[in-house]
Each structure stands twice: as C-alpha cells, then as structure tokens.
Amino acid sequence: MKLTVWTYEGPPHVGAMRVATGMTGLHYVLHAPQGDTYADLLFTMIERRDHRPPVSYTTFQARDLGSDTAHLFKDSCRDAYERFKPEAIIVGASCTAELIQDDPGGLAETMGLPIPVIALELPSYQRKENFGCDETFFQIVRALAKPVEKTARVSCNILGPTGLGFRHRDDVEELTGLLSEMGVDVNVVAPMRSSPSDIARLGAAHFNVMLYPETCEAACRHLERAFQQPYTKTVPIGVGATRDFIAEVQGLTGVTGAPDENRLRLPWWSASVDSTYLTGKRVFLFGDATHVKASARIARDEMGFEVVGLGCYNREFARDIRKLAKEFGLEALITDDYLEVEKAIEEAAPEMILGTQMERHIGKRLGIPCAVISAPVHVQDFPARYSPQVGFEGANVIFDTWIHPLVMGLEEHLLAMFREDFEFHDAAGPSHHGGHAPKPMHDAPAASAAAGAEASMAEETAAPSQDAPAATGGDVTVWLADAEKELKKIPFFVRGKAKRNTEKYALEQGVTEISVDTLYEAKAHYAR
C-alpha cells in the first residue's frame, strides 16, 4: 500500500459494493471501522443514485479492538436481515478489518440465517477493485445459479454491468435493443438490475454476453463449465467491433437477423470534409483494458488518428494490452501510478488524450485536450441524457465526445493565419473572454518588433520559460528573436517538446544563445 492523492482502483471491497449496489434483494454486510464507511458518498453523490447502497457496517472503533469484535459482526448481520429482509447476504471485510482476522464468512455461517449467506475472500493487500467485482459476482453466481430449462426462443444473459460503471446503464439499454433487432431475447442482465432469484435462472439462456471482462469473466467461465453456455469474446464498442459482435452472436446461435444501421453516423461523419483534419492526430490512450482496446481500434481504423501511446491500470489484463501495443508498434504502459502516466503523456506530446478522470486533470495541466473513455470517472460522466458507448448509437456518441475537445481544421487554419494579429497573437488571451483572459503560460510572450533581439534576450534571461531546464552554474540559455519566431511556426502540440529538446541540446553543446541554426541542429540531432 502507498499514500497517494489519486488511485485508479479502490480496494476489492469497493468492487463488492459495486456489485451489491447494482442488484436488488441482496445485502452486503461489511466488517469495517468507522473510516471505511463511504459507500453512500460513492454511489449517491458521484453516480447520483436515488437510493442508498445496500451495505451495512459493523463500524468498530479503536476502543473495541481490546475486546472481541466478532459479536459486533454477528449483531450487524442479524440486524441487516431483520431490517431489510434480503433474499441473500454477502459478507466480507474491508482492507482495515482484514488485519484483525475475524473471519466474517465463518461467523455468518454459524448464525443459521434462513437465506443464502455468501462469504467473500477478497485479499485487500494483493488485489484491487475490478478483481473485487469479478470475484464477488462469480461467488454469487456459483452459489445461486441452478440448472433450469432453456427458454423457447434464443436468449442470452448480459453480464458485467455494475454500480459506478462507466455508462453501464445506457450500454445495457443499447445492447438490449441491438439484440432484439437480431431476434435474441435478454433473459437476465446481471449484476445490475438483477436479484438473487434472477441469478438462479441464468442457466435458462442459450449464451452469455461478456460485456465487461473486468467484472464478469470468472462468472462467464463458470457458466460455460456448469451449464454449457458459450459466451461472446467481442465487446461491441465501435463500428467494427459491433459488426464483429453481431457476426459472433450469429455464429453462436444461428440467427440471421441483423440490426438496422440507418442510425449509424460515425463512418460518414469521420469521412466528411472537415473531419479529414482528424487524420493523423496524435492520441494517447489510458484506462481500463476493455475500453483502451476498443478505443485504440476506433482511433486508428475509424477516426484516422495516430496512436502514440497506450496503457491500462488493471494488471490482470497486462498481457492483452502489451500484445495490442505491439500491433501499434508501441510499448504498453502498465501502471496504477498517475505520475508515471503524466510523465509518459508529457514525453509523447500527443494532440489529444483519451483516458479517465485523472487524465482529464493531466490534460488541463499540460494544455492538451482530453476525452474520457473509461472509469474511474467523476459526476459529470454520469449524464442525465442517453449516452451509451456500445452499439451503433454508442459509436455516434464516441465520435461526438472525441471531437468536441479538439480545434477543428478550419478553426486552426484561421488561428494560424491571424497569429500575428494584435488581437489573436500568442500573448493575447482568447478573444471571447474579452480583456479579462489570463495570459497563456506555456510560451514566453514574443518580443515586440521595436524591442528587437536585445529586449527578447533580457526578458528570457530575467524570466526563463517554465519549459526550460534549470540552468547549472553560470550557464544561462536565451532565445534570440529570430529563433523564437521560428519556434512559433512549429505546431503548438509539439512546440513544447521542440523547445525542451533545443534547450537541452544547447546546454550539452555549451551554447548560451539559441539561434535558428541551433534550433535546426537540435532537430537533426534528435531525429537520428
């Protein structure tokens, strides 16, 4: 464990909360101290749920540790059953409570409650939130699913959506409609929108849709072994992936129906005149493995972007992401440290970031546009509107989401054309903010024509750019006016990197004044 201001995943008991919160008729009794009782905040504030999560806590305090805390857990279990009358209870310990080793599962089994009690073994110090989702759902399915007769019509279970998931609510709706157009009924959606009695009839479906491997792959594998239910391997995010998914379902079931593509707009929108400016845009992707894999395909094959970096934070899928990165000629970034991600983004100098809420903050710091493609996300990414990621409508939503942060072709050409204008030059704030806009911080202001090279040098010496490396000893590197002017001709998205490389080269060569020649020598040096 480590102290950090940001984490991509919480401890595994948060994953168990997500499963329990998505379901009805299930209650989660969590052996936890006062400080671990934050489920209400997570689900009612961030996800805007209109009801509290079904979680009860033992809420032991420091003074309780000198005595037996097992009775606190038993009392909490009994109170939860009598108050909420659930169909089943899951029990476990938080990361802190795990240290006192009270064995909540064993304690609950001795109580003789008249409902199924499912014990969770979630190693808080080895695994994280997505594992908690996957393992919790697997244990629920293993305990409750029973052999039942198959449905008369071809049907499936949609598995994986949970509470606090990125667009899970709308993805379920979109996918249900897509399957309906194919002639496939949905038997159960789980864990979200299901109850323990629904879990019991999972076996009635002919196959399972593995919508989010992070949260349901173990359950899908179990159902395949126990009930001979095959499951889909393609996640239908993006046009190509959705078509592959349709073909996979047709192959599994023999159905010939296909959904209507008339409402699909991404292919034409991305081929339209203004969108040709998207071609070659350099993007960096980071998030959970499922959304990164899907987004990488969309970025390259459907939007015409150039992927310059990709990675994921969930190490369980590191092998898949490394394999994908090789196909793109890249080295995958597998880390849960946001500082490593920020460093990689800064070095890659992309024109756009596709990531999580943390990458949105990184983008703001670095001045790079960002679109959110993956959990963890904040409250603004649980929209009131219908906004799926899967299926054909999901592809339309993705197109809109990704291009909105970008400066489109004509707009950027106009900005370049009027770069020297008194109102639009680099030292002026955005015109729509009037005179109150702050001056940009990423580049030093250009010296005026009258001041000439000497004023520019003095200004740079007195207030060096934040991009410049710290001078050592008496070495001070300054930009001559003509070099500074030439630097501004470099596209803004790589200008910072070019400036840093030039200054580094100048320091290595002992050059104290950067001229146009120095700029191009540095370019040639780093191009080797």
Swiss-Prot record:
- Active site per the UniProt annotation: 274 (proton donor)
Q: How is the cofactor bound?
A: Binds 1 [4Fe-4S] cluster per heterodimer. The cluster is bound at the heterodimer interface by residues from both subunits.
The GO molecular function terms of this record are: 4 iron, 4 sulfur cluster binding; ATP binding; metal ion binding; oxidoreductase activity, acting on iron-sulfur proteins as donors; oxidoreductase activity, acting on the CH-CH group of donors, iron-sulfur protein as acceptor
Q: In which pathway does it act?
A: Porphyrin-containing compound metabolism; bacteriochlorophyll biosynthesis (light-independent)
Composition bias of kind Low complexity appears in 444-465
Statement: the UniProt record of this protein carries the keyword ATP-binding: yes
Q: Where is this region: Disordered?
A: 429-471
Instruction: Provide the binding site for substrate.
Output: 409-410
Q: Which GO terms describe its biological process?
A: light-independent bacteriochlorophyll biosynthetic process; photosynthesis, dark reaction
Q: Does the keyword Iron-sulfur apply?
A: yes
Look up the record and name the cofactor or cofactors this protein needs.
Answer: [4Fe-4S] cluster
- What start-end ranges are recorded for coiled-coil regions in this protein? none
Which reactions appear under catalytic activity for this entry?
A: chlorophyllide a + oxidized 2[4Fe-4S]-[ferredoxin] + 2 ADP + 2 phosphate = protochlorophyllide a + reduced 2[4Fe-4S]-[ferredoxin] + 2 ATP + 2 H2O
Could you list this entry's UniProt keywords, alphabetically sorted.
4Fe-4S, ATP-binding, Bacteriochlorophyll biosynthesis, Chlorophyll biosynthesis, Iron, Iron-sulfur, Metal-binding, Nucleotide-binding, Oxidoreductase, Photosynthesis
Q: Which residues bind [4Fe-4S] cluster?
A: 36
* A Pfam family recorded for this sequence: Oxidored_nitro
**According to the UniProt entry, what is the EC number of this protein?**
1.3.7.7
What is the enzyme's main class?
oxidoreductase
Quaternary data: Protochlorophyllide reductase is composed of three subunits; BchL, BchN and BchB. Forms a heterotetramer of two BchB and two BchN subunits.
- Tell me, in a sentence or two, what this protein's role is: Component of the dark-operative protochlorophyllide reductase (DPOR) that uses Mg-ATP and reduced ferredoxin to reduce ring D of protochlorophyllide (Pchlide) to form chlorophyllide a (Chlide). This reaction is light-independent. The NB-protein (BchN-BchB) is the catalytic component of the complex.
**Which PANTHER family does this one have?**
LIGHT-INDEPENDENT PROTOCHLOROPHYLLIDE REDUCTASE SUBUNIT B (PTHR33712:SF7)
The entry sums up its family as follows: Belongs to the ChlB/BchB/BchZ family.
Q: What is this protein called?
A: Light-independent protochlorophyllide reductase subunit B
Taxonomic source organism: Dinoroseobacter shibae (strain DSM 16493 / NCIMB 14021 / DFL 12)
User: Lineage, please?
Assistant: Bacteria, Pseudomonadati, Pseudomonadota, Alphaproteobacteria, Rhodobacterales
